[in-house]
């Protein structure tokens, strides 16, 4: 059973289905039943579980036999997490539990897939569903023999993390009243269900609460976990630098949206003892714990954390001490390792120190500032567990980007990394690093079918997502929720080049930034460089003489296709952009295509498009196992599976460092670069997705 064909892909997939329902019940649309022995029955069904399982098996279309193992993992730590608790990787106790479970899954010998399935079924029966889902996903992604098993869309298995809690009561009613084969009308999710525009931060709710944006963050942290016993799971190429770059781009994109709404750029949270004016009421319920996510009132403070149940005992003094040590490392350009020796500080080390991942050079000295900051923010309402309250949305990778404070915290993280980039130990780029002799960009433009030149068009779209895979304890059949989100008309870049040298390759780098700052003044480059959002990056052959490059927006190296954010789990592989599932599991991490372009304004927001054709001799990477890239999607944010990051330059190049000579973007432009004024215009209407199920129109 070592090949991953047919059943061996289908059966592991079923462990994602209806995560809060026990495995005794049928799974999947075909009502498949796992044949459980007493050892594999959940503890609460110990008396009659096998009998119930057999009874369900009588109606099943498929019965899945399970191999009986000589021994099962003890899960001494992981079994302590109650099945109805919420799970957060940011809590030390939960990290230890996750490490224990991932070890058990990774330690099953390769190609012993019956053993692997039985081990996972045992874990699924005995462990918290959210803990299981995370560990199972990481294991599937990192085992060579399971990488063809698709990681299920988290918004469909745990829909309560992505949408208004009132939806689920209505959804259960629909499944109970309407038979499975009757078309069901979608449940409409209103656009403004968490607040009103009296709260100015709410103007950005469409962006912060977007399903695709939150799925991106969840999937990125699945691909780049910060802790594991097997170092190789964490120690991926340039991982710390990617932590900086991906989050830097989130802040830049968020700031673009803020400017479109006449708001200032996000203010970093740097005084950790001052009140936090931003309140947040998530209006989400956890279907696992059957409780609402705790809100945060305005003007609450961080407080020292002492929650033994979570393994948290940290003071603000600890955080400030770690911060001083990080600042000293930045100001001296040196980092002190755990053994007392010192090494040069680079951005990759700084990212791992700040987060902190297990790759941090010295956890004792530099702590875990980023992760603990999330915990401080998540427990302001109950820092000592006096009220038995769980954490706020900011401590869960799938919900954290909903909270306005996420951006204030990450603005501080980004500012700390930028101080390193601006320090004397990181030299600005020289002209020879920026130029590409013989390559001259003569013009650049963007075109939209039937639209005005150099104008990008955004609009609202409403789409349906099927909730039935996450609706535990209800009848089968599709139940759709319809929600509205920002989208953009497809466009293409047209770049004209004169190459006076011989034929060669080049890397095309495309960025965009608002033309004016909050005061409607022209930016200084020192500020605008942090506002440039990466739109695309690709390698292109150039002929001698005149060349014209056209590139579609849907081919962006930053994004994943729309279908991957809102895909149904069953019809796999119909997307021509996806070569195989293994790459999807990795490349499923990526910025959502529908959020590629900032919202703009109805009057038209002024942006600048920047295009650079860099010298490929300085860009190219020698990949292990050759340069055959299996997955081109979203490599800018997510790297490539089992390979080096596909660009030798610093992430964010050429804007990751200040310029020593240019004071504004016009001064920065060399012959191999071009700048083009463009307009982003919002059409404030809602269009139906033509792919919505016919029953739902």
From Swiss-Prot:
<dbReference type="InterPro" id="IPR005203">
    <property type="entry name" value="Hemocyanin_C"/>
</dbReference>
<feature type="glycosylation site" description="N-linked (GlcNAc...) asparagine">
    <location>
        <position position="260"/>
    </location>
</feature>
<feature type="glycosylation site" description="N-linked (GlcNAc...) asparagine">
    <location>
        <position position="552"/>
    </location>
</feature>
<comment type="subunit">
    <text>Heterodimer.</text>
</comment>
<feature type="binding site">
    <location>
        <position position="221"/>
    </location>
    <ligand>
        <name>Cu cation A</name>
    </ligand>
</feature>
<keyword id="KW-0325">Glycoprotein</keyword>
<feature type="propeptide" description="Removed by PPAE1">
    <location>
        <begin position="1"/>
        <end position="101"/>
    </location>
</feature>
<keyword id="KW-0470">Melanin biosynthesis</keyword>
<feature type="disulfide bond">
    <location>
        <begin position="587"/>
        <end position="631"/>
    </location>
</feature>
<dbReference type="GO" id="GO:0042438">
    <property type="term" value="P:melanin biosynthetic process"/>
</dbReference>
<dbReference type="InterPro" id="IPR014756">
    <property type="entry name" value="Ig_E-set"/>
</dbReference>
<feature type="binding site">
    <location>
        <position position="217"/>
    </location>
    <ligand>
        <name>Cu cation A</name>
    </ligand>
</feature>
<dbReference type="GO" id="GO:0046872">
    <property type="term" value="F:metal ion binding"/>
</dbReference>
<feature type="binding site">
    <location>
        <position position="247"/>
    </location>
    <ligand>
        <name>Cu cation A</name>
    </ligand>
</feature>
<dbReference type="InterPro" id="IPR005204">
    <property type="entry name" value="Hemocyanin_N"/>
</dbReference>
<dbReference type="InterPro" id="IPR036697">
    <property type="entry name" value="Hemocyanin_N_sf"/>
</dbReference>
<dbReference type="GO" id="GO:0005576">
    <property type="term" value="C:extracellular region"/>
</dbReference>
<protein>
    <recommendedName>
        <fullName>Phenoloxidase 1</fullName>
        <ecNumber>1.14.18.1</ecNumber>
    </recommendedName>
</protein>
<keyword id="KW-0186">Copper</keyword>
<comment type="function">
    <text>This is a copper-containing oxidase that functions in the formation of pigments such as melanins and other polyphenolic compounds. Catalyzes the rate-limiting conversions of tyrosine to DOPA, DOPA to DOPA-quinone and possibly 5,6 dihydroxyindole to indole-5'6 quinone. Catalyzes the oxidation of 4-methylcatechol. Binds to the surface of hemocytes and is involved in hemocyte melanization.</text>
</comment>
<keyword id="KW-0479">Metal-binding</keyword>
<feature type="glycosylation site" description="N-linked (GlcNAc...) asparagine">
    <location>
        <position position="498"/>
    </location>
</feature>
<keyword id="KW-0503">Monooxygenase</keyword>
<feature type="disulfide bond">
    <location>
        <begin position="589"/>
        <end position="638"/>
    </location>
</feature>
<dbReference type="InterPro" id="IPR013788">
    <property type="entry name" value="Hemocyanin/hexamerin"/>
</dbReference>
<dbReference type="InterPro" id="IPR002227">
    <property type="entry name" value="Tyrosinase_Cu-bd"/>
</dbReference>
<dbReference type="Pfam" id="PF03723">
    <property type="entry name" value="Hemocyanin_C"/>
</dbReference>
<keyword id="KW-0964">Secreted</keyword>
<keyword id="KW-0865">Zymogen</keyword>
<feature type="glycosylation site" description="N-linked (GlcNAc...) asparagine">
    <location>
        <position position="313"/>
    </location>
</feature>
<keyword id="KW-0560">Oxidoreductase</keyword>
<dbReference type="InterPro" id="IPR008922">
    <property type="entry name" value="Di-copper_centre_dom_sf"/>
</dbReference>
<feature type="binding site">
    <location>
        <position position="410"/>
    </location>
    <ligand>
        <name>Cu cation B</name>
    </ligand>
</feature>
<dbReference type="InterPro" id="IPR037020">
    <property type="entry name" value="Hemocyanin_C_sf"/>
</dbReference>
<dbReference type="Pfam" id="PF00372">
    <property type="entry name" value="Hemocyanin_M"/>
</dbReference>
<dbReference type="Pfam" id="PF03722">
    <property type="entry name" value="Hemocyanin_N"/>
</dbReference>
<comment type="similarity">
    <text>Belongs to the tyrosinase family.</text>
</comment>
<feature type="binding site">
    <location>
        <position position="374"/>
    </location>
    <ligand>
        <name>Cu cation B</name>
    </ligand>
</feature>
<keyword id="KW-1015">Disulfide bond</keyword>
<feature type="active site" description="Proton acceptor">
    <location>
        <position position="355"/>
    </location>
</feature>
<dbReference type="InterPro" id="IPR000896">
    <property type="entry name" value="Hemocyanin/hexamerin_mid_dom"/>
</dbReference>
<dbReference type="GO" id="GO:0004503">
    <property type="term" value="F:tyrosinase activity"/>
</dbReference>
